[in-house]
Amino acid sequence: MAETIKVRALPQAHCKDCSLAPLCLPLSLTVEDMDSLDEIVKRGRPLKKGEFLFRQGDPFGSVFAVRSGALKTFSITDAGEEQITGFHLPSELVGLSGMDTETYPVSAQALETTSVCEIPFERLDELSEQLPQLRRQLMRLMSREIRDDQQMMLLLSKKTADERIATFLVNLSARFRARGFSAQQFRLAMSRNEIGNYLGLAVETVSRVFTRFQQNGLISAEGKEVHILDSIELCALAGGQLEG
């Protein structure tokens, strides 16, 4: 059975040397500010696929920035079923939703070998009082979570299966591009079943849509490798949503 992982401090790249810093941190932070932040960040051993970073109901104490790999967050419904609420890529924060109730409302599990930076929230909150630009960054991140939730509600309420999957692929493409990776060719860390769970679609529907997209020349896909062949048409099908 997968276990919740406690992140233990190990020597790793510092914030100011991290290639993800421009995405993860406000650009206005000075080297001295980054050093202050670096002092509170814990960096542990990588999580293996299937290991938990935290579980639904665990006491809230830290937020986590993904350094490499990918995580999924999910909640368990009253019927005991898993409902995926998000996929998280390098530079993205996980765990902020625990601030309200002081427990994590979702579980976070590694989709592949994944490294994270653990940031104890109390110390982050104290530091953000000294660094207004850091507090603004936290507010931006919380705003993005609200926006993502709103977009997801719209996605599930109004879009067809083709539109949902097109939106999902365009969103991933934009997020990979922002991280300096190819926007046209990337590997999906999640399974077709997990994509279906997230988008409210049966796995058979997901497979049929991927096949149809390939037949129509929108993408090519082999296993988890995806190559977007017609980004303009895919974006049009997604309703023109290019933002990650």
Curated annotation (Swiss-Prot):
GO molecular function: DNA binding; DNA-binding transcription factor activity
Protein name according to UniProt: Transcriptional activator protein anr
Gene name linked to the record: anr
Residues where a nucleoside 3',5'-cyclic phosphate binds: 21-149
SUPFAM superfamilies (alphabetical): cAMP-binding domain-like, Winged helix' DNA-binding domain
Stored Gene3D superfamilies: Jelly Rolls, Winged helix-like DNA-binding domain superfamily/Winged helix DNA-binding domain
InterPro entries recorded: cNMP-bd_dom, cNMP-bd_dom_sf, Env_Response_Regulators, HTH_CRP, RmlC-like_jellyroll, Tscrpt_reg_HTH_Crp-type_CS, WH-like_DNA-bd_sf, WH_DNA-bd_sf
Any single biological process term in GO: regulation of DNA-templated transcription
Annotated HTH crp-type domain residues: 159-232
Entry keyword annotation includes Repressor: no
Additional record remark: Possesses 4 cysteines which may bind a metal ion (possibly iron).
Stated role: Transcriptional activator of anaerobic gene expression.
Superkingdom as given in the UniProt entry: Bacteria
Keywords in alphabetical order: Activator, DNA-binding, Iron, Transcription, Transcription regulation
Residue range(s) of DNA binding per entry: 192-211
